[in-house]
Amino acid sequence: MNAVLVEAIRSKRRLSFVYNEKPRIAEPQCYGIGHKGTELLRIHQLRGGSEPEPLFNVSKIDSLKMLDEHFDKPGPNYKRNDSAMKFIFAQL
């Protein structure tokens, strides 16, 4: 379990990280274990990709930083208890 991801979700703080060699800025929505046992992160993406609320394999995230920027609400398509995850560490 990644404590930075849990804290970022609980405190509604934005993240910066690199994924597939692209820098990203995101609002974390849900973090847990997928049905195949992979740690997954659902985000609302602000910069760095074309999908607004993609799902990321946490093991492929590099240079993870919690920013001193807060957000107020989930992304427009967010649904609690993400069906892609069998166990959830933290969610909005």
Enumerate the predicted regions with their spans:
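Core beta-strand-centered patch of the WYL/Sm-like small regulatory domain
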Residues: 1-92
